[in-house]
Amino acid sequence: MAVESASRAIDGHTGRYFYSTGTATRYYAAQDSFITQVDDVSSTALTLQTSASGDGIFDTTWAVGDYQLEPLNGNVDGLAVPYTRIRAVENYLFPVEDEQALVKLTAVFGWASVPISITQACIIQASRIFKRLDSPLGIAGFGDMGAMRVSRYLDPDVEQLVAPYRRLRDFV
């Protein structure tokens, strides 16, 4: 239970989840004619469709050469990461109409494998949650300086370990 709670706390703090949900279909509103921000995609095997006329009928299926997954090579600052953006290339453009979700993506969402630092952060936070049972009302004990309190927030070491994976969402 502590491990599951720690894992969900890390997911919430980073704005992403570090497991694969399998293949699913999701809908997005393009940021502009060239870029669509998407949830974490762990595989290049996907189906991308758009509604060219804006009527919600996804009648245009894009070929692999019509788009580019980013970050390129699934790597940022030496860290292996999933794809989070799709860039239109060649002859296609994303439809942009009043922030409507006119992009349909069928893909494997999530992460292919859990990064080592996320696993370590989960272990640290889980042990903290487990030890929380020994600190009723957040008081871990009394020392020379008075009561020692246990924070209800993420452990500072955990925050540092997960910081490179934090994602701020700015898309629909």
Regions found by a protein language model. Give the residues of each.
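Divalent metal-cofactor coordination and adjacent catalytic microenvironments
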Residues: 1-172
